[in-house]
Amino acid sequence: MAQNDHETVDMLLVGAGIMSATLAVLLKELDPNLKMEVVELQESGAIESSNPWNNAGTGHAGLCELNYTPQSADGSIDIKKAVGINTMFEVSKQFWSHLVAKGTFGSPKTFINPVPHLSFVRGSEGIAYLKKRFESLTKHHAFETMVYSEDKATLAEWMPLMMPGRPADEAIAATRVEGGTDVNFGALTNQLLQHLAQQPGAQIRYNQKVTHLRRADNGWRVTVKDTRNGGDREIQARFVFLGAGGGALPLLQLSGIPEGKGFGGFPVSGQWLRCDNPEIVKQHQAKVYSQAEVGSPPMSVPHLDTRVVDGKKSLLFGPYAGFSTKFLRHGSFLDLPLSVRPGNILPMLSVARDNMDLTRYLIGQVMQSPEQRLEALRKFYPEARAEDWRLEVAGQRVQIIKKDPKKGGILQFGTELVAAHDGSIAALLGASPGASVTVSIMLGLIERCFPEQARSPEWSAKLKEIFPAREKELESDAELYRSVSSRCSEVLELTAKNDVQAPVNAE
């Protein structure tokens, strides 16, 4: 390739999942003149973690996920994380409603549907915790619509599939928020990509593998291989975003930026039990989360979810965790060993030493029999029959391993944005709550990598138009929260009666 034989873009985004799609469309909203390209290794968008069947949980808003509200040593409930995730999800809703209102999408029902969110516990300790959680959360305006019950008749209305077959004296309780949602991030991603592809100066190319990243005078020189015809090309980009899910870590290492030194990855795979039997599916219209078993990691929180994909309802139960050395579902078994570097070997060994309980848990999950999986399901749905459910492999998650001055290395659950000091390249690492808070994460990236533009009158005005209220305002101003949330729910058709709604009585 000749010295000058390269393409030039303002923005190069690696990975055609929800993160890159959101960032690209958001940047185009802020500056329509930007020239950008999205490159994706697979043959289409949203193949990996953004795919609805690979996504461990959707519509995360802190309403039902008990691991977001830990109990402190003094017995109090810490609601900070739940409030933070709730307001971030509201920011996502603002972006989606902005795009719906301007006609970017068709019906919002193609990607978001109303599904109540419930927390469900068994036993006196679980009930005491849930009641205290309810009392703590409902003091905040973001959770004021939450209701609590221990009444079996009420619970049968909320969870008609889950109540028959339980012992009459079983101590159970639940909270319910009617305004929860289910989000098909695969459909949302592909609609964002379709919209982006129609914009001047934007293109999306599939079957593209990034093989080299190196600094250039004005940004980065990136070598991309076409996996179908084998040809290489070079792209000169002022800014590069590595939004390739589990594949972001190897690309970050390839960049060589000092900010990426010391990071490692711990891959965790997932499996689900899936039910498509309409007679069963119609009896459950909810996402019901419970507590993880004592000593189990956060990704093990069991839940029984209504999923709406392409207009059809299914039920998913799990997740059952597993272990694979792949960083992507369509990745290589060499991903983990090839990610070991002199700079991250100590953190990775430290995590291996300090997380033997997690290792044992994952081995136990891998060794589970079908009967053991069914037994876990029956804690939610006592009358479950094996023939109505099938086991499906879900997507890969790569949890973050990072340096720690005391322990050498720690395993971090969540997401982390890693950016070069000059803002010319950024990578998103980690997993949950992931997709549900994509918009907030990408806004954070814009403020970090494009600080001057973000403060400019043009970008500031556009951001205020798209986002009438950001996270801190939503957290502190109850009236603003109510008005913005209500308007977004109306635009996204979350307040009207949904055609996928199931009956709630127990008969």
UniProtKB/Swiss-Prot annotation:
Listed pathway(s): Carbohydrate metabolism; tricarboxylic acid cycle; oxaloacetate from (S)-malate (quinone route): step 1/1
NCBIfam families documented for this protein: mal_quin_oxido, PRK05257.1-1, PRK05257.1-4, PRK05257.2-1, PRK05257.2-4, PRK05257.3-2, PRK05257.3-4, PRK13339.1
Listed name of the protein: Probable malate:quinone oxidoreductase 2
Keywords: FAD, Flavoprotein, Oxidoreductase, Tricarboxylic acid cycle
Similarity comment: Belongs to the MQO family.
Cofactor(s) the record lists: FAD
GO biological process: tricarboxylic acid cycle
HAMAP family: MQO (MF_00212)
Superkingdom classification of source: Bacteria
EC number: 1.1.5.4
A family per Pfam: Mqo
Xref: PANTHER family: L-2-HYDROXYGLUTARATE DEHYDROGENASE, MITOCHONDRIAL (PTHR43104:SF2)
GO cellular component: a single term: cytoplasm
Species of provenance: Pseudomonas aeruginosa (strain ATCC 15692 / DSM 22644 / CIP 104116 / JCM 14847 / LMG 12228 / 1C / PRS 101 / PAO1)
Lineage, broadest ranks: Bacteria, Pseudomonadati, Pseudomonadota, Gammaproteobacteria, Pseudomonadales
Catalytic activity: (S)-malate + a quinone = a quinol + oxaloacetate
Molecular function, one GO term: L-malate dehydrogenase (quinone) activity
